[in-house]
Amino acid sequence: MPSAFVQVFRTPDLRKKTVFTLGVIVLYRLGSHVPLPGVDYGNVQRCVDQASGSGGLLGLANVFSGGALLQITLFALGILPYITASIILQLLTVVVPRLETLKKEGSAGQGKITQYTRYLTVGLALVQGTGLVATARSGALFPACRTASGIVPDTSVLAAVVMVLTVTAGTACVMWLAELITDRGIGNGMSLLIFVSIASTLPRALWAVKEQGEIAGGWLSFGSVVLVGLVMVALVVFVEQGQRRIPVQYAKRMVGRRSYGGTATYIPLKVNQAGVVPVIFASSLLYIPALIAQFSHSDSGWAAWITRNFVRGDHPFYVVAYFLLIVFFAFFYVAITFNAEEVAGNIRQAGGFVPGIRAGRPTAEYLGYVLNRLTWPGSLYLGLIALVPTVAFAGLGGANQLTGTSILIIVSVGLETVKQINSQIEQHSYEGFLR
């Protein structure tokens, strides 16, 4: 890996892309520290300091925004609306015939879907921005802070509209920066910005664990968290690299005097075919009842029950519900994103076949059977990765940000980026033979 990064800076084209990507990342981090107009930044900082190390309903969104959400900055929503819009469009592609047709039209259809994703991102940003501003003005963003109601001194409608439009424009800017990285930089822009956002919160979270530790000056807690984190990173790397390769053989054809086909390839089916999406789905679904309870009367029985069972991530009821939702969404997402019949049809049209399996429907059934067997350990792995840090680090200040979701995203994005860098290095190494 170190030699690959050295090779990047020796290749002019890759060096230019790397510098461009780093420049965009710097702009993104700068925007994450620009406060929204009408926000009392000093008051926000006092409330954030009091809330540091405690759990929160918006914890996942705050981590995805690099801490900008609770800071109420220009990029407070971060890349989350874009992620949500992309997932929604991906799901709708399966059930909306028009979108499915666009998906099959190649680059032109994909461009149209990208345009729809942008529109949906802006719409979601308006809704989420309105919710953020309303939460901040009511003081519910920092329920434990006594001065939370003074975060937004100006309570006029005009001030609220300006704040919502500003945070929506910030989301559109983040989306533009992500697409710039994808088009002119290295790696996937959306994934890299998530990577940067999560990585930026880790040093502060680790230091909070050390500061609030009670044994050996907090160094024992700090070392335990680091050790568990390293073990989980190794586990994620091992599982994310694991795949089942379905062999595909293409028959040899004679066209004139030339022979075509006769090659062998494979279909890579990953153990974790669903990625991190099931964890995001499960987290979002569990946040809804807790968020409703937060805005309701605290003396009501059902609100107290939800707060008691759903706010703390180490509560047994929460753990069981979270785990079952992750397993369910893992199977659900794999079922709608991997169309075994379509893959089998494409193989058949290209003159290929899986050795020992008849082409057509038997191949589709075989692919579905293998994928279901892979999804079971993959879903259990996702559930364990998401829950082990939450349960193991319960009671450690700042450790609520060191979630399995964060580790999973950081490792996955890192592996994918390194693969793309190696691919581009190999491509440049063959340029001399192609001239």
What are these regions (language model features)?
Residues 1-103, 108-435:
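N-terminal cationic and glycine-rich segments that engage phosphates or anionic surfaces
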